[in-house]
Regions:
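A short, Trp-centered hydrophobic/proline-enriched beta-strand micro-motif
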Residues: 74-82, 126
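A structural signal for short hydrophobic beta-strand segments in well-ordered beta-sheet cores
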Residues: 96-99
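Internal helix-loop-helix
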Residues: 4-65, 69-75, 116-122, 243, ...
Length: 313
């Protein structure tokens, strides 16, 4: 809400929706400088960078008027209801069902790996609205309030010790008939557009966080003498080169003027995940045997966190 009071939410949104409508170059500058300064993760980033662009592109004027102000003011938080126990990388295998009855959409099913569900007021959900449909067909994109009977949220304890992810169960949950984005059956199209926004400009800020992690690793290598190992020095150099390459490729994509760039952005995320996983492995090798047991103090604790979190990228 402090960021919102200064007008730092929705930088790229059209002015008609309360944004600043800044050009890509200035959005890049903001995200990188925010991360460079060590700014914390923002609770409302799912609403700001995923839900809001989706509503702007696919939502009705009534949906935009209802939901965008809460996101822009930092008062309403959203989470993403995509993955299921049997539908992760094969997202089209979704089994959560929804049906329209008595003026409401009713939901039955389960979502998993739902980031920040325990802190959110709303969830956007892909559910199967056409009985007997398979794959990408027959899916709908719903906006569902979480504070209601029929919704149960169970935290998932991570190996980092945190519980950022959750399981979300729908058993008799419902939402209003007009809380559907696009037409019934358009869910796949809307969901894929949203994933394009997910690889948008804020990822440049993520690279700056990666730069902080790399510097932490370099400092630790100096402190413990691991930098005397030629193979460690070579891998540190490779990590530095890889990070600069990621940034150059991201800027090249965004220079074309599109903040949501579809398949190219997904390939970029694949490269980012591989880079971060390699950094996590390097962190463990720099720590050596000191990293084998759970650390309670920095920098070992933070390096272990890098390794743990990189497993899920």
């Amino acid at each position: 809400q402090v960021m919102a009071s200064g007008g730092w939410i929705g930088l790229g949104w059209p002015r008609a929706h309360g944004g600043r409508e800044l050009p890509v170059s200035l959005q890049v500058a903001f995200h990188e400088e925010y991360a460079r300064a060590g700014g914390p993760g923002r609770m409302g980033h799912i609403g700001e960078t995923l839900m809001a662009p989706t509503l702007i592109d696919f939502g009705t004027p009534e949906q935009q008027a209802r939901f965008l102000p809460g996101i822009r003011e930092g008062k309403v938080f959203w989470c993403q209801g995509y993955s299921e126990p049997g539908a992760g990388s094969d997202l089209a295998a979704i089994r959560t069902r929804c049906w329209l009855e008595d003026g409401k959409w009713h939901l039955q099913g389960q979502k998993v790996w739902t980031s920040l569900a325990h802190e959110s007021e709303w969830i956007f959900v892909i559910a199967r609205s056409t009985p007997g449909s398979v794959g990408r067909d027959g899916l709908s994109f719903l906006l569902v309030p979480l504070d209601q009977p029929g919704v149960e949220i169970r935290p998932i304890r991570q190996m980092t010790g945190e519980a950022e992810f959750n399981e979300v169960f729908f058993d008799g949950a419902c939402t209003a008939a007009d809380c559907i984005v696009g037409a019934p059956g358009d869910g796949w199209k809307v969901a894929m557009a949203l994933l394009g926004y997910e690889r948008g400009l804020s990822t440049l800020g993520q690279q700056m966080h990666f730069s902080h992690e790399l510097q932490l690793l370099v400092d630790a290598a100096h402190a413990c003498g691991a930098d005397q190992d030629l193979s460690i020095r070579r891998r540190i150099a490779d990590a530095w080169i890889g990070l600069r390459t990621l940034r150059a490729n991201a800027l090249r994509i965004f220079a074309r003027g599109e903040a949501a760039v579809g398949p190219e952005a997904l390939v970029y995320k694949y490269a980012w995940s591989n880079w971060h996983r390699n950094l996590g492995e390097l962190a463990m090798d720099v720590m050596g045997t000191a990293g084998d047991l759970e650390a309670q103090e920095d920098p070992l604790r933070r390096l272990q966190q890098v390794f743990f979190f990189s497993r899920a990228d």
